Structures are given as structure tokens and as C-alpha cells.
Amino acid sequence: MAIGLSTYAFFWRASSRVPNPLGLAAMLEQTAESGAGVFQICDYAAVEALSPAELEKLRQRAVDLGIQLELGTRGLATDHLTRYLTMARALDVRFIRTMFNSATHKPTQDEALALLRCVLPEFEQYNIQLGLETYEQVKTRDVLAVVDAIDSPALGICLDPGNCVAALEYPHEVIELTASRVVNLHIKDFAFARQEGWVGFTYSGCLLGTGLLDYDALHQTIRPNERNINQIVEHWLPWQASAEETCRLEDAWTRHSLNYLYTRNPYANRSSHIL
């Protein structure tokens, strides 16, 4: 099992809102420097434009740094998942996260079943796992029903309990419901804050260990160390007063999250290039 960083852990530092946004190579280097053992390139469209030579350069640099790569995308379209499978093979990736819906397609449960059954034989052939993420756009029971119906070692759940609150699903219930099918974990904390004037609440991210995520219960239920399930750090960090302050806080949250997780997972794999 390894602990890693998602591109979502670099959300603001890689965005156009900051003066010198990080590119993919810089995020990979910083992942290694942090001591994390995995870099999940998630919802990062630029990776789709990389040439075979550029993919090989990225793969080799990850090998040199002792970093395991993972991929993340959205949607179940056959051509799209086949494309990501090809990229995964080029990058020595063993896990791809996806979601039911893309920007242009929202399949029914039956359509999702048919689409996944079309591509999963290739995933099984190349020993690459596909994880369907839990999130508010599709009820967790519906996602789980598809995974259960297919019952393939190449298909599981990418568990992110915080996403499901917007669908009025309790995080602890989502954890219990999906536990046996989880193959990847997204770790971020979250909290409600009452707005000024008592006119509603904001639901957003917070420093890991200070919000509503019961990490110890999650860890006890999922048993990531025993089951070799990678834990990937993400953030829902609101924009701060300035780009400088936002980037500083994002980096601080990342370092805190890694320390928090390694303290509770002392045998997790680490990068070989810790500074």
C-alpha cells in the first residue's frame, strides 16, 4: 500500500489563477520530494495530448523517482476508456479512476453495465483496475449495483465519502456500504461552516483531521494496509485572499495530510527521493 498525491492536491498551484502554475513534470517532482509514493493524474486533460515519446519520458521519470503513477478521468464511453487503457499501459499504470458521467454523457444503470462489460475484458487482460468514484451525481447504491453485477477483479470502487454528502448520503454509511468493493481511496476532510448573517452554510474542505471525516473509522473498515489499497490525498481548499496565500496554504495542507496519514500508516511505501 502507498500514500499518494492527486493533481487535486495541486489544484490552485497548477491553475491559471497563479502567476507560475505548475506543470505535470513539476507536480511529479514535488510529489517525490514530499515523500509520497503515488502520483494520481486525475481529471488533468493535458495528459491526453502527450505523445508516445512524452509518455515514455514521464514514465521513466516516475521510475527514477520511485513514484507509482495512476490515472483519473470521467465517463464510461468505450473509446474514451480504451484510450486511457492505452495510456495506462504506456505509463505502467495499474489503476484508473473514472465516474459514471462525463460532460456530454450521463448513462443509465443499464447503459453503464453494457459499456463496462465492453471494455473490462481488456482491463482484465492487462491487469489494470478501474475504479468508479462515489460522488453526488449518482447514488452510491447504483454505482455499487453495477460493480456487484459485473463482479470483475478489474472493477471496484474509488471511495470518496465526502463527495456523497451533497446527495444527502452519510459518509459512514457510504463507507460501510462500499467497503468490500473499494480498490482506491481519496482522502480529504470536509466541514460545514455557517455563512455570515446565518443565511445558510458553506460545505468545503478543511485541514485533515479537523472536520467530519472519521479517518480512523474509515481505516478500520477499509483496512487499506491489509488489502493493498492506495490512499490518495486531495483537497477542497477555498481560494484565499491572494494567490500567494492560497498556494502557501495548499502546500501546508498537503504536508500536513501526508504526515497525518504516514503517522497512521507507518508501513506505507514512500518515494525514494524524499528531501
Swiss-Prot record:
- Protein's organism: Pectobacterium atrosepticum (strain SCRI 1043 / ATCC BAA-672)
E.C. code: 4.1.1.120
Could you tell me which SUPFAM superfamilies the record lists for this protein?
Xylose isomerase-like (SSF51658)
Q: A Gene Ontology molecular-function term?
A: carboxy-lyase activity
Show the Pfam families listed in the entry: AP_endonuc_2 (PF01261)
* UniProt KW Nucleus keyword: no
InterPro entries linked to this entry: IolE/XylAMocC-like, Xyl_isomerase-like_sf, Xyl_isomerase-like_TIM-brl
Name the record gives this protein: 3-oxo-isoapionate decarboxylase
Q: Does the keyword Metal-binding apply?
A: no
**Which domain of life does this protein belong to?**
Bacteria
Instruction: State which pathway it belongs to.
Output: Carbohydrate metabolism
What is the protein's known function?
Involved in catabolism of D-apiose. Catalyzes decarboxylation of 3-oxo-isoapionate to L-erythrulose.
Swiss-Prot/TrEMBL keywords:
Carbohydrate metabolism, Decarboxylase, Lyase
Supply the PANTHER family for this chain.
HYDROXYPYRUVATE ISOMERASE, XYLOSE ISOMERASE
- Report which gene this protein is encoded by: oiaC
Q: Which reaction does it catalyse?
A: 3-oxoisoapionate + H(+) = L-erythrulose + CO2
Top-level class of the enzyme under EC nomenclature: lyase
